Each structure stands twice: as C-alpha cells, then as structure tokens.
C-alpha cells in the first residue's frame, strides 16, 4: 500500500453521525469472584492479541495487556440509529457504521472485504501480573446509594416509597445467577478498590481486566468484594458538561472508549481488574492525542501477542515481520523502544480496538509518553512514541510496515498480515468493565479519542496476532497481577483532581444483537452504575461527534456501505433478549464480550434535553421526559430483575412488556443462521462454531445513502426456560368415564373399565377378527343390570351407526344371548341379554313419534324466525336432525333384520314391522321398508307366508304407480319388487365387510380382468383406421378399427373347419381381424379331423374362407393350443401385417363392417359387402368349401395370383415374423405357467413354439414379466429356465442373450426398480444352485453389459448372497474359487476389492483356505452335545439363520447333517425356543417358528423320513413338559401352516408303531385328534372340488 499523507485530518473517513438511540448495553462481562483463570477461557476460533503500551509519566507498573477486538472489522465504532429516531441531514461523520455482533451467529468475526478472505477478529489479551485473589467475602445486604449525593444511602427512602433521584432507570440483573447488588464508584465504601481511576490515573483504561471475566468461570456465584473507593464522588463516567469542555481540544472525542456498561465487580478479582484498568488508559489517551504515528505503532501492535501462537490477521497495512521471539526475562526499558512516525491514516491503531475492548470489558494497556499534553496540541506533527513492554520482551523486534493511505477503495482490500512472533510472555487476559477513565488533564481525553480514530488499521493488524495466543495466555499471567494491582491502587488513591474523561461511546455502536449475544454471565454482572455512566457520557460524545463531522469529509468506502447495510439489516432494532443469551457458557460469554469488534457497542448515548437533568449538574433535580426513559426499556439490566432486589411493586416489574413492532422482511442472505439453518432469533443458546457466519454479500450496494432507513422488524423472542401455562377452563368438558364425580365409587370404576374394554372390542370387530374378539368378550365380567344395559347400549349404538357391520354386531349379540344378571329392583329375578336388547330395538323403532315432535318444534322455530341468518341456521339444524334420525332408523331396521336372520326375533315381530312401515307413507318409513325386505325378504317369503307377502308387494306396486313419492323412493321400491321376481338374488354383490382372504381373492380376479382388458385395448389400438400396412405378399391394407371386438376364444371351442387345417377368414387375408385357425387356437390336424365330422355343421362361415392352395403349409405345428392360454390369449388380436400365426378371434360382423381393403377392385360400400357375405352364408351347406362367386373372384384376382407365392414363402414368413408373434405367445405361456405352476405343460408349450434360435425372446419376456412381481414368481421362473436349459430345449446362448437385453437397461431401470439387482439375482440363482450353468460362464457373460456402468460387482454380490441362503457360505466360497474368478475384473477401476467385499459382507469368499472352525476335525458330537450347542445358538445367542448355517457346516459333515440325531436336536431346540410359559399354561410363539422355518426347511429337505424324526423330537419335548393341553396341537397347526411338515409325515407319525417312540404317544394322539380330523376333511373337500 502506498503511503499518502493526509493533511486535512489524521483520522479515517467517517459516515454521518446519526442521532443516538437507546440500546441494551449488555456486552460488558460480569466480573465475578473466582479462583485463577481457567486454562481454556477463550475458544479456539478467537484470536488473542497483545498490544504494547506507551511509557507513562506515573509510577505505574507496566506490562503487556491483551485487548480483544470487537465486532467492527473495518468500520469505526458508530452505527446509525434506528428508524424511529430523526435522521440528521447527510454529511460526513466521524464514525463508520458497521454490523453488530448480533448480526452474526457468533459475536466476533473479521471485516469483510470483497477480494479478501474473511478472518475472525480475536480477543486481544492484555497480560498483566496476576495476584492471587483476596479472601472472599460473604454476600452483603443490598444498599442503594445516590452517586450525586456523595454516595448517600437511599435504600430506605426507596423502600418507603420515596422516588429515587438516580438519573438512570433501575438496571436489572439477570435472574440466572444470584449476585449481590453492584455499586457505583462513588457509592462504594472506603475499603473497596475503585474501578474507575482517580484524577491522576489517566492511564486507567476504560476496559476491564480480562482476568476478571476469565475468572468468572471459576465460580458461578459471585461474592461481595471490597472495592477501592474513589476519593471523589465525581469519579464516575465523564459528564457531558466536562465533555463539552474538552471539545475544543479534541478533534474526535467520540472515539474515546470507556465501557458504558461497567458492572462493578464485587469479587476479589476486582482488585486485579482495577489495577489492570489503570494501566490501559494512558495508552489510549496518549495514542489518541497524536495525529501522526510511525510504523513503530504497527510493530508493537503486531508484536503485542508474544509467545502466543500467532495466526495471520487481516491488516490494513502489509507488515513484514523481521524479528524473532527472544528471551523474556528482560527489563522493560531494554525492550523495543522505537520511534514511530506513520500517518494516522496508515497506522491501524488500537484505539478503536481499545474502544471495542473497553466496551466489552477488555482494555489495551498502552503507556503514554511524558509529553502527552504537548502532543495533544500538535495534531499534525509526527510523534515519537516509546513503547515499553513491561515483562519478558524480546530483545529485538522489528516489523516493517508499509503504510498506505486509506481510501474508500483500499480499505476493504488489505492483505492479511503474516504471523508475527510473540513479543512478551502470555498473561492472563484482563477485562475491565470500567465505563470511565479519569485522566489528569483534558488532553488525555483527546489522546484517547485520537487513539480510537486509528482503530481501523491497528485492529486489523492485531486481530491475527491474537489467534494463537489463547492456549498460553492464562498460564503465565497469574503471577503478574499483584504488581499492577498495587500500583493501580496506589494511583487511584493518590489522584486528588476530579478531572474526568468522557469515555462513553455512541449507543448505536453496540448493536442490539451484540447485547443479546452476551452470555448469562455478562448479564449477571450488569450494575446500576453502568447505566449512570452511559448517561454521563452521551452528551459529551454527541458534541465530539459534531465537532469531528466538520473536519473530515472523504467519500464513503464501499465496504463501509456494506457494513452500514448489514447493520441496518441485522442491528437496526434493539432486540430485548436474544434467545439463548442466558444459556451461553461463561467462556463463550467472555469471548463474546471481548471479541465484539467495537467499543462503540457498549456506550449508550442518551439525548439530554435542555430542560432535563444532565450528568454535569450534580445537584439539579432529576427529571426526564417519557422518551428519554423509554430509551432504557430493553437494556438487559432493565429487562432482568436482580436476585436480591426487594419486592417494590410500584417500581420493579417482574416481567418485560414487549412492544409490538411491525414485522419486516429479512434478507435471507444476511439473516445469520446456524449449521442447521436455524435463524438467529431461534438460536437457543447455541454458539455457532467457527466465529462469525458467512460474510455479508452484496449488502452495501442496497444502501447507497447514509440516511436511507428500513422499517423496524418485529423481534420474536422465544424463551426456552419459561414454562407456558395454558389457561384452563373452569367447566371444561371431560369424558364421562373421566369425571371426578364418578371416579370415587370403586364399583363405578369397574363399570367404566368394563365399558372401555367393550368399546375397544367393538372398534376392532371385523369378520376376520370375530372369533378372537368374542373370546375376549366372554372373559368380561358383566354381573349387574347396569353393566348389562350399558354393554347393550354400546353394541346397539355401534350397530345402528355402522349398518354395514350389522351382521358382525348381530352375531356378537347372538353369542351373548344367554347372558343373565340379577335385576336391580328385584333381587330374586334375573334379566337376560336378549330381552334387554329387543326392548332397546323396539324403543328405537317406535321413536319416530318423538322425532316427529322434535321436527315440528324445530319447524315452528324456523317459521317464526325472521332474520335470514337465523332461518338458515335453523333450517340446517332441522335437516341435520332429520338426516340423523333417518340414518338411525335405517341402521336399526338393518340390525333388526340381521337379528331375525339369527332367530333372535320371531317372524310375527317382523311382519308387524313391515305392516307398520307400509302404513306410514312417508319416505323415511318406505326407505326402511325397502331396507328391511332387502335384508329378510328371502326368509319371510316362504310358501305359507306368500299370500301375506303378495299383499305387501301389491301395496308397494300401488305406491310406485301413484307416483306420489320421490323418484328415489320409487326406484327403491321397484328394486325390491324386482329382487323378489329374481327369487331374492341380488344383481349386485353384497357390499358388506370382507375378510382379508376375500379381498385378496377379489383383487386377483380384478387384476386378471384388467390384464385382459389391457390386452384387448392393445389389440384394438393396432386396428386404428387409416394406417396402411404392406404384408409379405406385397398387399397394401387399410385397417379400420370401427366397432372391432375381440371375443374370448373359449366361446368358440367347437367351431372348426370342415376341411383343411387352415385358418378361417371372413375377409381377405390381409384384413386385420381374421379369425385364427379355428377358435381352438391351433389344434393339431388329427384333432381337427376328429372334430370335423361332429362339428362341421357349426362352422357356417367356412365358405367365407379363401381357397387355400394345396401346397400351403399347415400352420398347426407352430400354433398355440388355446387350452393353455385361455386367460391371456383371448384378448390378443392379429397383428396389422397379418402374420400367418393368429392367436385371437373376432366377430364376423366386425370385418363385414370394417373398412374396405385395397385388394378389392371396386370401391363397394360396406353395406354391399355385408349383403354379399350374408347371401353367401345363406347358401352354405356347411359340408364343403364353396368357391367365391364370380364377382368376388374378379375382385380378388390380384390376390389369387399372389397366393402361390405366399404359400411358397410360408416357411420364410414364419421365420421372419415369428419374433413379434413369439413374444406374444411367450407372454401367454409365462402367464399361464405362473398361474398354475405346471413345469411340464410350460416346457411342452415352449417346445411347440419350434423357435430355436429365437427363444431369447422367451427368456427376455420371462425376465421382464416377473421382474416386478413377487419373489416366489421369480423363483418359479428361474426354475423353469433351468429346466429348459437342462432339457436342452433352451440353449445357453439364448439364455444369456435374453438376459443381456435386460441387463443393458438395468442401470436405468434401477431408478424405477431400486432392487432390480436382487430381482435379477433371484431369477439366476436357481440356475447356479442346480448347476445348470457354471459359475464362471454365467458371471463372465452377465458382467459384459454391466462392466461399462460399473454394476457387475453389485449383481454378483446379490447372486452370491442368495446362494449363501440356499447353500452355505462354504459351498459358495468353493464355487467361487473353483470358477477361478477375480473380483478386480468385475469392479470399477480404482475400487478397493477388500473394502467392497467387507461392505457387501462377502469377505468369506476372499479366503482360499477354510476358516479355523472348518479346519478343525469334525468329531462326532453326541445328541446331548449337539442339543446344547444348538440351544445356545438359537435360544441364548439368538443367532440368525446364517450363523446357524455356518456353525452346522463348520462342525458337521454331510452325513451328520442328515442324521436323526442332528435333526432331533435341531427340532427340539427350535420348539423349546418357541414355547411360552404363562404361569401354568403353555402356548406356542408362532413368530419364532416362522423365523426358523428356513433352517427347518433346509435340513428337513422335504424328506418324509426326516420330517418324521422331527415329529418324534417334538413329541418327546411335549412329554418332558408333561404334555400341556393343546400345546402339541398348536405346534402341529403352525408346522403345517408353514409347510415345514407335510401331510404324509403327519399321517406317518399318526400310524407309527415304532416301540422306541411310544412314550406318551397315546396322550399325544388324543390331543391332536381334532387336527387329524380337520386334515382329512380338508383333503376330502379338495378332492371334491
């Protein structure tokens, strides 16, 4: 950067100062008593910097101090006020606005430069000697003192109701941690060390020792601590009057830093903090008074983080480090005293950093030269500062800084500074929350302000040095506190002159989010003193800002504009309490404070009006206007009530009153978010790692004018700690069973529990669950009349509410019909369920009169209503009541009918109901009548009752003819009449509830129907008119699809041709709809001859068939038998090009009415064609083929000539066209095979296709048609393919080719079929398992289309996994090794084989040698040992099937696996695992059996003898348990249902007379008698079907 001297002003360009606004100064760290600073106070993402200080003329022990830079990267410490305050006219201001820490997820970050990476600002730690904390004191009683009355105790005055004349509103303390009340310096007792320096202590920095903040982590609850008393009550913050006095001597006083929010530390650490604070002030004062500085300042700034791990820091100047860290045990005077002469614009001074740090509780310790007063007067002259490092400075440190003038374009683009070596030993960070620094003369104020003006550049240099310090700072700092404390205390007591410096900052420096981001610890340490100091500073700061705004007017830097925008976006409005601010850890809170990048944040500038009290007027009357006081509304100190504050209800509020601010839209780019996209206002205490969030992009360009404002946004505060109490209604509705009045009686509780169980059962009642639920009902205790009536009411209400389930509810009542209970009023008598139920039904049936009364009343109300809204409401209520009554009546009638069908009601009662309903001619009664007759008509309409029924129906017909009722009712009556005429067989199926089996069955039928319709539709689509096709004979045909129909060939099974075995054609050959060869679909010639004699007369259309040449090759060998494809082939029409192998039929009239063909010589109309064909039909005798008449022969002259050619080429045509036809026939074969699973039939059909070389089409169709179906379907298809290959009906080449067509598209198909690789493996596995094709051959062929897409390994792993389930890991590994295959050949290049196998769990394949367990000699295990091992695996270890397979194969050979010993041990272990003992009863856990079915199936292997051994083992296990009732029957049921044991094995066990197995056999047989009875009955039924 080129150095460019600034002649007009030594300060940075500043934006216009805007009116101050009330903010929440909560960023000051709370100084809390604690032991030594913890070793890790600062987070790893924050920098810690040390700044050297100037030598002071006072006897003050000097040492390096650490300062923590604030959130303001490149902008000076001032930000425009919110929109609700007036905006001054645009003009240059001495401060830059910038985003506050609340604008980012973390409290500190680095300046954003467009072309430079963002670095995080770091806490600058001012190491000083640390002295052991003094003895802790107990918590003191709260005393409230008035600083304007010399510290007079006014506690009693306030408690007694007298108003306090304190100029600041009460500043509440956070409620999270109880702390004693804070005190102002003028209020503290004599023995307490003063935090604000005395007159002589101009060096007292406006920042607190970092140690104080660090130490606060040690102890959560601070204790009162003596503080130094200021010799003068005026040692508060500088008053505005004094500030004005200094205006003439300072050019930019506003930059003076003093933490406005200074919580007076009541802890022992205050002493050290005060000591450190006394050291820091001279630096800021001295520096601020100098207009020009040399690069030595930069050097010292960069060297200010000695011995610490330095990190590159963004710097405004490019600084080259030329010195190395040196020994630290040297005196201060020997250390780097370098003259500094650099233009203030070029030197990034620490002033703003000081300002920031002071506000957040950290001060830079800078020593001022002795000539401070003189230098103050020379604003443009270069100044030589001698900076001394008090302790352990390096002998030689030299930084070469190339200053450059800071212009609007250059500020944002400074390069980061390289890491600088440590210059001094690390010290404990010092945080001084002092709000005012008193100096010996007004020039000190000027000095401090000047230093602040240089903050832009110096802070950037410092920010990097601090990054690596944090791990060391606390280690060596403890020992240096004592010296500094002593000197500071001495100085503070010496100072006799009450000169004060205004060290406050504009209130807008600290953004609302900055305050809200402070931790719970920071909020706790807020003092009332802090607010007073803020008030005293504001006026002075305003005057200094006005003065500075007159002298410096450079253009605004674009980066600053961006910052201004960011401030507006994120920091415009003060946020009362930031979510999670209290839950941030203490360490984070310290960092948050120390790292906020501007001291401006803590100063609160309040507009003192002429008529109101001012801090300079100590004796004046304290009165303020409303706006002034409202400025304090959302300060954290005002929001949170102190712990020990007395309950002054008139003054102190318990809760904050949130203002309702208008909502504004937040720019999503600026709104800070956490890593999970949580916005900042919902950040519940989470500290975002990594410092600040993403830098603000393109923000400055949206605010080009300083005065441009955005409307305030609404602050949404969410408290996660606050319990939200919902308002409870006094008379809230509760369910009857939960009301307290009923809960007292134990009998009532039992009754309600009974009703609850009945409701639960009723809700679950379905036809499928009926038996199971009825068992539960039978177990209920219904022993009183009240309970019985309650149960009946529940059942009845449920039945009439759900008429479709009335059958189930009626059956439930049938089961309960015998239930009797004693009557309540007559103890000797009983009442039964049936009587009460019928009474309930009758009461509901006769309820219509009561309903009519209700309806009449509502109708009168409706007629009397005058208002339209009232009429509408009443009308709706009336209609709703009628509808409800109608539905209840219909439900009741339906329920009554079902009860009658179950013989619970007599026939006479039903006739009475019918008569009653017929008498009432209202629509509701007639609808009920229809529903009743539909339900019970068939049962009432028997021979004896027919005359009565005739009367009913005659009356109904009369009602229909009279047409006095609505059409809906008339149609309902007519439907019932028609139903009786149809012998009560409904046209529609019953729409009641169905079982799962019924639903599945109907779904399967529906699916088949849909497939048939789709196939018909596809056939019709191929007949679209106007599409010309050229057949093999060269004929152009126009296919018309008008009115075309395809019929099921099963309806034409007996229609055959009387002569040759050729197809029937109703129109010329190329016409699309010609019939197939007979509707039989290709019967062989012999079959056709046999049928011809008996059925030839049926084929009346045989004369329409064109004459076939004698040389024509019959097509029967390749035709497909219709018997095999009735379900799927009936919908298939012929192809447009009229292949000679038709497979479908069509109506004759379809083609009589179809479009004319091009082979017709004349353009005769369709009517003429139809007429000629009908005349021909009439002439048929049915015995012989008749030649066409002369006209037709003439028309077909061309076709006749082409006929021989076609017949000669028939074989070639068949081959050329067979692929598409073969696809269709293959689909038919596969559909039928999957439906009936007849391998023999399917193989015969494939053989009849006679399409060697084209069977790859069959394979492809098989794969495609089963790919998305069930696993069993794919397994069956794989088995069929294996058998075809095994029988050599399907060649391996066709097999591979058929699969390859699918494999080429498999990767794309995986999008729609995610498990396609598993499905393909299921189709292939049977081939490998049975050895139809070798592993090597299949793997190589299948991988060819998959290698380009890198999926070969995936498919191969799925195949191997399936093989492991069916064979064993050992065998699969052997197969792989025998195939001599390498995984590298099947995986994408660069993929690690071992990792792939581990991921796919195929690592067992890698090992060439068997595992150790397999290598062991397989000794013969006894039955007991086998059982114990298997029991441990299955019951204790709960091993999965794979583990059991592995163990068995590792320990047993093939002979042992088939031995009865092993089979019995396995069956015993599985059955034992499945037995559940409930007290004295036993039952079977069918889930365990189902889980172990694969193991049983594998080793029993469907072998009857092995299954018999398993049954013997089961019998022995039951005998050991003393044969619990029904346990063996349950096992038999489960094993039979899961198809583990076959019927033959059960019968064999039943009839077995083996003497070794007779123990308990008789009892076992007796217990399963019902099972065998059911088994035989089921077998007989299947035979009958």
From Swiss-Prot:
Q: Where is this site: Cleavage?
A: 699-701
Q: Where is the MI domain?
A: 1221-1343
Alphabetical list of CDD domains matching this protein: W2_eIF4G1_like
Please list where the region (Necessary but not sufficient for MKNK1-binding) is annotated. Answer: 1571-1585
Keywords, A to Z?
Answer: Coiled coil, Initiation factor, Phosphoprotein, Protein biosynthesis, Repeat, RNA-binding, Translation regulation
* Sequence ranges assigned to domain MIF4G in this UniProt record: 755-983
Which residues lie within the region annotated eIF3/EIF4A-binding?
Answer: 699-1019
Q: Where is the composition biased (Low complexity)?
A: 10-21, 594-603
Molecular function in Gene Ontology = mRNA binding; RNA binding; RNA cap binding; translation factor activity, RNA binding; translation initiation factor activity
Segments for region (PABPC1-binding): 134-162
UniProt-listed SUPFAM superfamilies: ARM repeat
Residues recorded as bearing Phosphothreonine in the entry: 168
| Annotated spans, EIF4E-binding | 619-630
Q: What does this protein do?
A: Component of the protein complex eIF4F, which is involved in the recognition of the mRNA cap, ATP-dependent unwinding of 5'-terminal secondary structure and recruitment of mRNA to the ribosome. Functional homolog of EIF4G1.
User: What is the protein's name according to its record?
Assistant: Eukaryotic translation initiation factor 4 gamma 3
Please give the organism. Answer: Homo sapiens
């Amino acid at each position: 950067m080129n150095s460019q001297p600034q002649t007009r002003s030594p300060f940075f360009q500043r934006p216009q100062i805007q009116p101050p606004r009330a903010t929440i100064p909560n960023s000051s760290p709370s100084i809390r008593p604690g032991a030594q600073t913890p070793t890790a106070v600062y987070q790893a993402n924050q920098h810690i910097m040390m700044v050297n200080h100037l030598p002071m003329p006072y006897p003050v022990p000097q040492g390096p101090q650490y300062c923590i830079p604030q959130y303001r990267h490149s902008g000076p410490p001032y930000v425009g006020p919110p929109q609700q305050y007036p905006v001054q006219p645009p003009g240059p201001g001495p401060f830059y606005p910038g985003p506050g820490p609340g604008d980012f997820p973390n409290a500190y970050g680095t300046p954003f430069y467009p072309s430079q990476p963002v670095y995080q600002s770091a806490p600058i730690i001012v190491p000083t000697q640390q002295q052991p904390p003094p003895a802790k004191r107990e918590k003191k009683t709260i005393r409230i003192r008035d600083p304007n009355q010399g510290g007079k105790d006014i506690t009693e005055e306030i408690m007694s109701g007298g108003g306090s004349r304190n100029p600041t509103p009460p500043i509440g303390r956070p409620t999270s941690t109880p702390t004693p009340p804070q005190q102002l310096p003028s209020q503290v007792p004599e023995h307490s060390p003063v935090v604000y320096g005395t007159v002589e202590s101009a060096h007292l920095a406006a920042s607190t020792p970092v140690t104080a903040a660090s130490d606060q982590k040690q102890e959560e609850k601070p204790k009162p601590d003596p503080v130094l008393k200021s010799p003068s009550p005026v040692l508060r913050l500088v008053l505005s009057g004094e500030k004005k006095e200094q205006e003439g001597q300072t050019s930019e006083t506003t930059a003076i830093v003093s933490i406005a929010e200074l919580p007076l530390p009541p802890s022992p650490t205050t002493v050290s903090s005060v000591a450190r604070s006394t050291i820091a002030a001279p630096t800021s004062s001295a520096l601020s008074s100098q207009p020009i500085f040399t690069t030595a300042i930069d050097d010292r700034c960069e060297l200010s983080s000695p011995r610490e791990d330095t990190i590159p820091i963004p710097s405004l100047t490019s600084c080259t480090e030329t010195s190395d860290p040196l020994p630290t045990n040297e005196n201060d005077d020997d250390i780097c005293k370098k003259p500094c002469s650099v233009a203030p614009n070029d030197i990034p001074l620490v002033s703003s950093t000081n300002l920031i740090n002071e506000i957040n509780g950290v001060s830079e310790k800078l020593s001022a030269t002795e000539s401070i007063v003189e230098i103050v007067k020379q604003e443009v002259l270069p100044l030589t500062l001698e900076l001394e490092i008090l302790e352990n400075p390096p002998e030689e440190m030299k930084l070469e800084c190339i200053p450059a003038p800071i212009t609007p374009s250059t500020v944002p683009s400074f390069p980061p500074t390289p890491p600088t070596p440590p210059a001094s030993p690390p010290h404990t960070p010092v945080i001084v929350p002092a709000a005012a620094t008193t100096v010996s003369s007004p020039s000190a104020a000027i000095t401090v302000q000047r230093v602040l003006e240089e903050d832009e550049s110096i802070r950037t240099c410092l920010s990097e040095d601090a990054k690596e310090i944090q791990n060391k700072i606390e280690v060596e700092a403890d020992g240096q506190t004592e010296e500094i404390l002593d000197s500071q205390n001495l100085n503070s007591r010496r100072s006799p002159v009450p000169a004060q410096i205004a060290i406050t900052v504009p209130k807008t420096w600290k953004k609302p989010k900055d305050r809200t981001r402070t931790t719970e610890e920071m909020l706790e340490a807020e003092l009332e003193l802090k607010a007073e100091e803020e008030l005293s500073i504001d006026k002075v700061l305003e005057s200094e800002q006005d003065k500075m705004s007159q002298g410096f007017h450079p253009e605004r830097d674009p980066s600053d504009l961006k910052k201004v925008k960011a401030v507006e976006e994120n920091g415009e409005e003060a946020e009362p309490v930031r979510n999670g601010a209290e839950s941030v850890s203490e360490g984070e809170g310290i960092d948050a404070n120390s790292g906020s990048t501007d001291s401006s944040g803590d100063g609160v500038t309040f507009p003192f009006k002429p008529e109101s009290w001012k801090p300079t007027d100590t004796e004046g009357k304290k009165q303020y206007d409303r706006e002034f006081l409202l400025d304090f509304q959302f300060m954290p100190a005002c929001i949170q009530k102190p712990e020990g504050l007395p309950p002054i209800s008139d003054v102190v509020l318990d809760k904050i009153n949130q203002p309702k601010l208008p909502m504004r839209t937040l720019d999503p780019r600026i709104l800070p978010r956490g890593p999970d996209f949580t916005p900042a206002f919902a950040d519940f205490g989470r500290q975002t790692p990594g410092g600040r969030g993403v830098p603000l992009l393109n923000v400055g360009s949206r605010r080009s004018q300083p005065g441009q404002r955005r409307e305030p946004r609404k602050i949404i505060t969410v408290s996660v700690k606050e319990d939200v109490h919902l308002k409870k209604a006094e008379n809230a509705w509760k369910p009857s069973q939960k009301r307290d009045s009923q809960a007292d009686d134990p009998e009532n509780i039992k009754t309600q529990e009974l009703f609850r169980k009945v409701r639960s059962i009723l809700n679950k009642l379905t036809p499928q669950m009926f038996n199971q639920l009825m068992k539960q009902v039978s177990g209920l205790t219904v022993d009183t009349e009240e309970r019985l009536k309650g149960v009946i009411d529940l059942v009845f209400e449920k039945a009439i509410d759900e008429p479709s389930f009335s059958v189930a509810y009626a059956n439930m009542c049938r089961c309960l019909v015998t239930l009797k209970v004693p009557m309540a009023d007559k103890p000797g008598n009983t009442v039964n369920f049936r009587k009460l139920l019928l009474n309930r039904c009758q009461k509901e049936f006769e309820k219509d009169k009561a309903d009519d009364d209700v309806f009449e009343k509502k109708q009168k109300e409706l007629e009397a209503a005058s208002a339209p809204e009232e009429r509408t409401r009443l009308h709706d209520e009336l209609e709703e009541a009628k509808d409800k009554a109608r539905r209840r009546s219909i439900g009741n009638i339906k329920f009554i009918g079902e009860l009658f069908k179950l013989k619970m009601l007599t026939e006479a009662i039903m006739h009475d109901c019918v008569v009653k309903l017929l008498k009432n001619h209202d629509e509701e009664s007639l609808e009920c009548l229809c529903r009743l007759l539909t339900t019970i008509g068939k049962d009432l309409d028997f021979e004896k009752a027919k005359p009565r029924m005739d009367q009913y129906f005659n009356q109904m017909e009369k009602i229909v003819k009279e047409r006095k009722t609505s059409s809906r009712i008339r149609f309902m009556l007519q439907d019932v009449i028609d139903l009786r005429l149809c012998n009560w067989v409904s046209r529609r199926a019953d729409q009641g509830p169905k079982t799962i089996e019924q639903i599945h069955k109907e779904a399967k039928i529906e699916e088949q129907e849909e497939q048939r319709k789709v196939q018909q539709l596809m056939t019709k689509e191929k007949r679209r008119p106007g599409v010309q096709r050229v057949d093999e004979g060269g004929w152009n045909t126009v296919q018309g699809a008008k009115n075309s129909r395809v019929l099921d060939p099963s309806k034409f099974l007996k229609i055959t041709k009387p002569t040759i075995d050729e197809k029937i054609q109703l129109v010329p050959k190329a016409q699309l709809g010609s019939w197939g060869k007979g509707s039989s679909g290709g019967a062989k010639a012999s079959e056709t001859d046999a049928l011809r004699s008996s059925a030839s007369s049926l084929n009346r259309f045989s004369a329409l068939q064109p004459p076939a040449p004698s040389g024509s090759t019959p097509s029967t060998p390749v035709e497909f038998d219709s018997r095999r494809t009735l379900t799927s082939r009936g919908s298939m029409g012929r192809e447009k090009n009229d292949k000679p192998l038709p497979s479908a039929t069509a109506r004759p009239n379809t083609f009589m009415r179809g479009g004319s063909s091009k082979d017709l010589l004349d353009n005769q109309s369709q009517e003429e064609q139809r007429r000629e064909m009908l005349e021909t039909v009439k002439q048929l005798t049915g015995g012989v083929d008749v030649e066409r008449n002369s006209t037709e022969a003439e028309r077909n002259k061309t076709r006749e000539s082409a006929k021989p050619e076609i017949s000669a080429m028939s074989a070639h045509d068949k081959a050329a066209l067979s692929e598409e036809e073969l696809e269709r026939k293959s689909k038919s074969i596969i559909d039928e095979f999957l439906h009936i699973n007849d391998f023999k039939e399917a193989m015969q059909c494939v053989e009849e296709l006679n399409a060697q070389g084209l069977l790859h089409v069959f394979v492809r169709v098989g794969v495609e048609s089963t790919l998305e179906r069930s696993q069993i379907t794919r397994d069956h298809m794989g088995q069929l393919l294996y058998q075809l290959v095994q029988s050599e009906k399907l060649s391996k080449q066709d097999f591979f080719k058929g699969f390859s067509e699918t494999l080429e598209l498999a990767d794309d198909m995986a999008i729609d079929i995610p498990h396609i690789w598993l499905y393909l493996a299921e189709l292939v596995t049977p081939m490998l398992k049975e050895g139809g094709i070798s592993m090597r051959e299949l793997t190589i062929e299948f991988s060819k289309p998959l290698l380009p897409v890198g999926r070969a390994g995936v498919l191969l792993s799925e195949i191997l996994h399936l093989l492991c389930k069916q064979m064993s890991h050992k065998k699969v590994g052997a197969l792989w090794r025998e195939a001599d295959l390498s995984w590298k050949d099947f995986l994408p290049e660069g993929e690690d084989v071992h990792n792939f196998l581990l991921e796919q769990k195929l690592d067992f394949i890698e090992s060439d040698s068997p595992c150790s367990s397999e290598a062991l000699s397989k000794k013969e295990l006894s039955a007991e040992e086998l059982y114990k091992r298997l029991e441990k695996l299955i019951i204790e270890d709960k091993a999965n099937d794979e583990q059991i397979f592995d163990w068995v194969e590792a320990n047993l050979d093939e002979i042992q696996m088939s031995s009865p010993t092993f089979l019995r041990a396995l069956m015993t272990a599985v059955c034992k695992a499945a037995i559940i003992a409930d007290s004295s009863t036993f039952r079977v856990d069918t889930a365990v059996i189902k889980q172990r079915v694969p193991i049983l199936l594998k080793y029993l292997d469907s072998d009857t003898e092995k299954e018999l051994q398993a049954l013997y083992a089961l019998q022995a296990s039951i005998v050991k348990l003393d044969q619990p009732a029904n346990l063996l029957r349950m096992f038999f049921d489960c094993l039979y249902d899961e198809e583990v044991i076959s019927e033959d094995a059960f019968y064999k066990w039943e009839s077995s007379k083996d003497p070794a197995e007779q123990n308990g056999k008789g009892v076992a047989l007796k217990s399963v008698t019902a099972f065998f009875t059911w088994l035989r009955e089921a077998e007989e039924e299947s035979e009958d079907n």
